Amino acid sequence: RRYVGALAYHLYDTKETELAHDLAHMRNLAAEYGIPIWMTEFSVPNDMTFSGAMEWMKIIHKLVATYDVSAVDYMWGFFGAWERNHTILSIEFLDGKYVQHHVGPLYYLTGQFSKFVRPGQVRVETHSSSQDLLVTAYKSGAQSVIVAINAGQEDRRVNVTVTDAVAPLHFSAIRTTVREFWSELEPIASDTSTFNVALPAQSVTTYRGGSIDSAGTLSGVGIKKSAQ
């Protein structure tokens, strides 16, 4: 055990039912020995399109929320101009010198997680009222991060309740849709533990914040710890 830092796997060449069984087995094995799980390589078809990149968002959510995965890697972070598919970032060089780079929906949607859910944060328990609303939440010290995916085809307005939070609350929000990338939304201020938000169809929105104490500084939010 002392020589094993993590359990790692890919998601290739497996039927859906077999994959679910295998991932559950790895989750249970990791829990038994207190070892983190890393999913170290995978890609999705049509990942240069927004709809394809949204499929990747669903995979990230399932790995983290259902199978307790601590690190999720895409197949290729970046390559040169000779490979534009299955890359989060494509960089062009000429005679060893930088020319330009290209990013697409995959870059921005992945960033809704990677820019804000940082190493050391702990995933906390969440519940959703709809199978199209995929929500995970994370906590580190005074900061809470909520990632909300509307995987459906209809815009939604929903209430977000931070259990056991001490009002007032303050959250910033950033969103990616087919028309906007990392768009900063109006900050959210609430005098209760519940606030109402709009989640456009096929979007990912990340909220950062927590309780505001009498001095106007961010204090801890009491949410039940679930998994790392």
Regions found by a protein language model. Name each.
Residues R2-G5, E32-I37, Y67-V72, R118-P119, ...:
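Loop/turn elements at helix/coil->beta-strand transitions in domains of secreted/extracellular proteins
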Residues Q121-V145, G216-S219, K225-Q228:
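Surface beta-strand/loop "capping" patches
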Residues R1-F42:
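Active-site neighborhood of glycoside hydrolase catalytic domains
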Residues P187-S219:
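C-terminal beta-strand-rich structural cap/linker in extracellular carbohydrate-active enzymes
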Residues T163-W182:
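Solvent-exposed beta-hairpin/edge-strand motifs
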Residues L7, L63, T110, I146, ...:
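Conserved, mostly hydrophobic/aromatic
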Residues P36-G111, R123-S129:
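Aromatic/acidic polysaccharide-binding cleft in carbohydrate-active enzymes
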Residues S128-L169, Q202:
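Carbohydrate-binding surface patches
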